[in-house]
Amino acid sequence: MIKLFFVLAIFSSIISYMNIDPMKSSFFLIFSLLFSMPIISMSMHIWFSYFICLLFLSGIFVILVYFSSLSKINVVKSYMSLFLLLISIIYFSPVSMEYTNYLGLSGFYYSIYWFIFSFILICLLFFMNFSSYFLNFSGALRKV
């Protein structure tokens, strides 16, 4: 079941990267977060999944506020989507860990959540790459 949630999270993040409309892209990025939450909450600290969810959603809504008034979007076809999907499923697939080795504070920050941190960082980088690559910034940001 965890693998299913993981594959759905990766799939929705790739669809978020492929989608041209920023509103739909943010919607699929939120789906990616929701599908990755069961994986995060299966670990030792359940409160940490809520913390990640709040930070991620606040970032997504800030991005939506700035990019909702778009006036022009460039359409560019990307053929790397299937390759990115395959590589992310292979590289970031969840594995079972022994929690007795990770009871220290350094294990909490580095060892257990390394793949989760990197997965969320990759999703946000995909979304920011999408935003900076497809937009002309004619009405995206505030004028100075």
Curated annotation (Swiss-Prot):
The gene is nd6. Keywords: Electron transport, Membrane, Mitochondrion, NAD, Respiratory chain, Translocase, Transmembrane, Transmembrane helix, Transport, Ubiquinone. One of its GO terms (molecular function) is NADH dehydrogenase (ubiquinone) activity. The keyword Transmembrane applies. This is NADH-ubiquinone oxidoreductase chain 6. It catalyses: a ubiquinone + NADH + 5 H(+)(in) = a ubiquinol + NAD(+) + 4 H(+)(out). The chain crosses the membrane at residues 1-21, 25-45, 46-66, 75-95, 108-128. GO terms for cellular component: mitochondrial membrane. Core subunit of the mitochondrial membrane respiratory chain NADH dehydrogenase (Complex I) that is believed to belong to the minimal assembly required for catalysis. Complex I functions in the transfer of electrons from NADH to the respiratory chain. The immediate electron acceptor for the enzyme is believed to be ubiquinone. Belongs to the complex I subunit 6 family. It is found in: Mitochondrion membrane. Its EC number is 7.1.1.2. It comes from Caenorhabditis briggsae. It is a multi-pass membrane protein. The keyword Transferase does not apply. Its main location: mitochondrion.
